Amino acid sequence: MQNPEDHHSDRELSSPSNTTKSNDDKNVEITLDIRDDTMAGQSVKNATKTKAEEAELEALGKNLQKKCSFGATIVRNVSMRMRLPSFKRQPHPPQTFDRSSTAAQNALKGFKFISKTDGGSGWDTVQQRFDELTATSDSLLPRAKFGECIGMNRESEGFALELFNALARRRNITSGCISKEQLKEFWDQIANQSFDSRLRTFFDMVDKDADGRLTEEEVREIICLSASANKLSNIQKQAAEYAALIMEELDRDQKGYIMLENLEMLLLEAPIQPDGEKGLNRNLSHMLSMKLKPTLETNPIKRWYNNLKYFLLDNWRRVWVLLLWIGVMAGLFAYKYVQYKNKAAFNVMGHCVCVAKGAAEVLKLNMALILLPVCRNTITWLRNKTKLGGAVPFDDNINFHKVVAGAIAVGVGIHVLAHMTCDFPRLLNASPEKYKPMEPYFGDQPRNYWHFVKGVEGVSGIIMVVLMSIAFTLASQRFRRNKIRLPRPLNKLTGFNAFWYSHHLFVIVYSLLIVHGIELYLTKEWYKKTTWMYLAIPIILYSGERLLRAFRSSVKDVKILKVAMYTGNVLTLQMSKPQGFNYKSGQYMFVNCAAVSPFEWHPFSITSAPGDEYLSVHIRIVGDWTTKLRDVFSEPSPTGRSGLVADYLQDKINYPKVLIDGPYGAPAQDYKEYEVLLLVGLGIGATPMISIVKDIVNNMKEEKYDHDLEKKTVSGSGRSNFKRVYFYWVTREQGSFDWFKGLMNELAVMDCDGIIEMHNYCTSVYEEGDARSALIAMLQSINHAKNGVDIVSGTRVKTHFARPNWRNVYKRIALNHTDARVGVFYCGAPALTKVLGQLALDFSHKTSTKFDFHKENF
């Protein structure tokens, strides 16, 4: 047998059987599990592959195979096979050897008191921190600094103190300080990877009186400590109830205490399996992992070609739109440049006037074009009623709006600089003979700059530059997102309000632009003054949309049916659905509340489903407008009930009036184009995904009802269109799960066919296996098995800890749905956009499963 140290992962090991034996000897395949410094046998089976397994591997190999132009080959040598003569099953190995293959190995995989460290390289860092923290304390580390020294964050300070106490008790250390030698002993124990050492350390933390027994009160205290470290306030409140549950489970004889072996049993009953790996064939998973392993193309030309090809395949819709736009701008600039090069002004001002006029022509185009991406009704109509969405990236409307704004800023700079630093000085310094052809346009030769500034052209141009500079600055992300902290009263210049109101300065800008275009230099004929021609249609279209919004919101009256304020500062408004308000899941609408601000409209995803008899939105309180909205709706109701968790109707006297406008198209509305969906929501970003899930659930109900009546299903958007829906909701607050608790419970009960997979992640809880969350994991398994309710979310859907391994999520979907096209819809913080988008590209390029990534973009 080969040395297990030659292998670094738990793979199936095999090699040809002994050639000296007869070929008629039966062969078996031994699967070994090698982890760290331990090895255990997992299975003994016939070494001959079944036809099904061969077909499965062959199919995946074909699916993973790409064309030669992509520079990829079939993955070979998935695992080495070792064929041995048949032998009798040997007795089970000793218990310490077999730990690797028990559920405890998975339950305590990574069950560390220090995250992502090891006893070797980690100690050097700990020593360095020790020297820094004890520089003024005679090389003795105080108990209060222990957590900081070993690398725990401040939020785990309480847990670190209890860990210190446990380690000190075992060594009979009674002082509140330790030396470096004692710290090394502590470190060796908490960094020890063996199951028994970790279990003993955790037991010592709970057993505060060191009598070898755990009482119900000690269990309650450690539950409180774990819940506090993981920011699980609800579990803290129910600590006594959960302690009683553990005692009921383990203290069957009602002795009033439990022993170490009872705690081990509890751990064995709560195995942890990394997300994304469940249900994966190990060989297939390894093949895909090898296929996805980054490879560097040595030929720079081929590498550049491959990168360009993938870029064009992934972004062809954006590319052709941008190329068309750039081409039109280049054509207009060249046209004006050549036109003015053949005029008399060229003899005085040279190429400067050509550049200024070329930039001005491009500015006219962009000032017209920038209005089109924000004509939301038009875009929604084109998205819903036409097939243009297949060629035009409507999802990028706001991004294109920003790109055009950048081009306008560049154009203004070129136009102004060309005039101010080149054209005007040349006019001032030209000889009388050379200047004479310019007299019809400028009159007598000017003597200073004031001549150019005081005219209509100069004044209008300066005012436009100032107003656009203000609007552009306040629209930048740092100002709009309140990332810049300014002293009072300048703090009013940041936030959404400043962005919203400053953008209305463009009403003045466009008015001045038309005036500026009429009074422009060097052109007298009216038909050559083309500014108004560029702007006419976009301004009419945009103005019509604003009028339509005002009219529609006043006609479509809504009544508030329900108001609720949830943990995590989320306000829910449930209102009546106006007649004719037809929308799709994933779309959004604008909300206005005159009691907060009569002029402000804010977009929010619709969280109700099209089949519901009401409209609902979930609003996260993050800015000045939403804060005021919460204050308005949280006033005490006339019945005396608290408005923060109120359920009362619109006909109450002091209830604020709400207007809505919409619905508007969004990327998530295209979910019906796919049979397999990956829905990802971060925090409040789950709202459009919830509407999609509700719609699918409603259609499942309709299908079931139709089936019960033995009728043919009428709905075209029902469950039958979807093979699988994966929904990942990641939030950092336990209370967030209350927002959609009813839907999750309903989904867990009725989705018997497993069409919808719900994965909840609470990032405030330390990763599965961390000592600070170990007891939470135990409680979770016990309570879910006994009562069918998750202790973190309070629903039937079990909650995962920390963050998903997104690569494993994609890998699992790619293996489960070969040759499929998967719609990936994401709504949340920008940080995850790049990660999910890049993974979608990687898996689309290297597997037969294609992932189409869509990000919500209001």
From Swiss-Prot:
Residues 1-13 have a biased composition (Basic and acidic residues). The chain crosses the membrane at residues 319-339, 352-372, 398-418, 455-475, 498-518, 676-696. Residues 357-514 form the Ferric oxidoreductase domain. Expressed in leaves. Ca(2+) binds at residues 207, 209, 211, 213, 218. PROSITE patterns: EF_HAND_1, EF_HAND_2, FAD_FR. Residues 171-182 are annotated as: EF-hand-like 2. It is found in: Membrane. Residues 134-144 are annotated as: EF-hand-like 1. Residues 194-229, 238-273 form the EF-hand domain. GO terms for cellular component: plasma membrane. Monomer and homodimer. Belongs to the RBOH (TC 5.B.1.3) family. This is Respiratory burst oxidase homolog protein D. The gene is RBOHD.
